[in-house]
Amino acid sequence: MAHDRRRILHFGVTAHPTAEWTAQQLREAFPWETAPRYLLRDRDRIFGADFVKQVKAMGIKQVLSAPRSPWQRAYIERLIGSIRRECLDHIIVFGESSLHRTLTSYFAYYHGWRTHLSLAKDAPHARRIQATAEGEVAEIREVGGLHHHYERRAA
């Protein structure tokens, strides 16, 4: 997650995350030398030797949070809670591919329409301001109808 606009840069789905899998996700998230300067992370076991080696090879400086201190990673903890409350608590997932499709749909909604107080009630991908002209207001369903946004159609 990029902290500046709360953008999700990359996500992966697996039933059994390992250090090797996590290192591969890092390579996929930042190809062609686009890696960030810092990586904030906790002390979970999935960040093992392979992951640490990959981080160093990419020139990223790791910033570890204190043990048992989720408040030090407030943005990502909030995102995980939002995914659970706003999406996964309402959907039955039938495997990894189903979860990947659901999260792809949710992140499209999250980036384009979900408001964030810290962004002055804007979305991570800034929305255009709609004119107040005459016209019908149309409901557009997101995440399979779980969420909605509204647009004014031209008269």
Question: What is the role of each PLM region?
Answer:
Residues 1-155:
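Charged DNA-binding/catalytic regions of mobile-element recombinases
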